[in-house]
Amino acid sequence: MRAGVVAPHRLLPGLVALRRFAAERFPPWATAPMAALLYAAPASLGRPGPLEAAGGALATFLGLLCLRIADDLEDLGHDRLFHPRRGLCFGRIDPARLRDASLALVTALVVLESTSMWRLGFFLGACAFYRAWYGSGRARVHAVVRPFLSNLVFPCAVLHGAGPAAWRASVPLALYAWLVAVAHEFAHNVRSVEEDRSFGPGYARALGTRGTAVLSAALFTGATVAALLLWQMLGRPPAFGTAIAAAGAGLGFFLARLLREPGSRHAGALYRAGILFGLTPALGLLLPR
């Protein structure tokens, strides 16, 4: 059996592992709509046909699932210490079988994406990047730089959805998606230096608690500027502008609380507000303009 090809008799156990993993770590009821939105919003700028749109949304969902699997398999040693109740950590999900399922998904994605050379190019490029990232790249990069590289999947997903006809118009949205994802990562990990030293990613050790909060706020501010650029490019549609203003005001409230009192107490609320803020431009693009 060639490397990278999953034997048929290993597929069924792999599918069981995949189903259990998705239910726990990538619940379709939440992730499928988000993946569809991540594809449909930039795709709306290029107006693809229904079949192409459905294939692109499915590919986005499966691609993000593969990335979630790769991330959890890479962090398995860490998670066994700090998240022992997860299925991968206590044996309910077999890592080898989950890896088999992931390889099968990658094969299916190559077939699915081959209908568009644009999308196939982005998919293969992402595979090459994340293979290098998980292989040795992540360990060589400073902790504060890691979120900027690990979250490149989001601007790539936007450009993947926009297609060759609309990628220029989608650049502000791609920048927005990237900055929000990175800001979200820092906001989620605003904690004390002691907490960070025990189980954190190293942001507080490098920047301090307040420094991590300030960087998160600066990135969210940059994302707001990118959203305003997109609004300008679209011809200033009122509904889109109103949605951005409302989401930005809500996020600003939680950012102010975090900056006033940095720490995990307010980081959770900002994390949830950041999700809504991150989805707003994508939802706004689907409104009548």
Question: What role is predicted for each listed range?
Answer:
Residues L51, D75, S136-H142, A165-R168, ...:
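Membrane-interface helix-boundary motifs at transmembrane edges
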Residues G63-A108, L179-A227:
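Solvent-exposed interhelical
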Residues A35-S44, A104-L112, F123-R131, N151-V158, ...:
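Hydrophobic core of alpha-helical transmembrane segments in multi-pass integral membrane proteins
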Residues V5, L12-R19, A128-R131, S136-A139, ...:
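Extended hydrophobic alpha-helices typical of membrane-associated regions
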Residues P33-A40, C89-R92, A143-P164, A204-T209, ...:
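Small-residue-rich segments of transmembrane alpha-helices in multi-pass membrane proteins
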Residues A40-L58, T107-R119, F154-L175, L228-A239, ...:
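Helix-coil boundary and interhelical linker segments in multi-pass alpha-helical membrane proteins
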Residues L37-A70, F82, G121-F122, A128, ...:
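Membrane-embedded alpha-helical segments that form the functional core of polytopic membrane enzymes
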Residues L11-A23, A96-A165, A256:
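Intramembrane alpha-helical segments
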